Amino acid sequence: GAGGAGGKGGDGGAQAGDGGAGGAGGKGGNGGNGATGATGLNGLGAGADGTDGGKGGNGGAGGGGGAGGQGGKALAATHQDGSMGAGGAGGNGGAGGMGGDGGNGAKGTFDNGGDGVGGNGGNGGSRGIGGAGGIGGAGSTAGADGARGATPTSGGNGGTGGNGANATVAGGAGGAGGKGGNGGLVGNGG
């Protein structure tokens, strides 16, 4: 949703009062989930790849921008040799908002099925924090979440990318961690 209008400054005096801050921007929507890959023909053919998760929506601008939506989670392919779809990228933060986290990659379900790649973290808005990178596709244990950056006055740091996990399925590679989002710049004075 759009940020609310600032309040009117006070009248009189040597210095007129400042207007009130705008309302916080609305949160971006979450990305859609990827589709499941098709089963191989008669149990012999390669399964189709899972599709990628949808991109998270962008946060609205306002007094403090809304957080970007999280990327959609990729779903698993259903047969041998079908690779997983990648997690969707996190949405970008609005002014002052955080970038959304990248979506998680899905685990391979059969031999030779590669794990999905974590989505990229969204970019921070003005003074915002970059979103954390997505988690790589899971084997027996999932990769760790990326750490969020700090918010010094010089602008927020990008989030740390998530760690890829080792796959337990035969021949399946661990998913790569998502890229950390970029820190936002300090905004100019009004």
Question: Could you say what each language-model-derived stretch is?
Answer:
Residues 1-190:
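Collagen triple-helix signature
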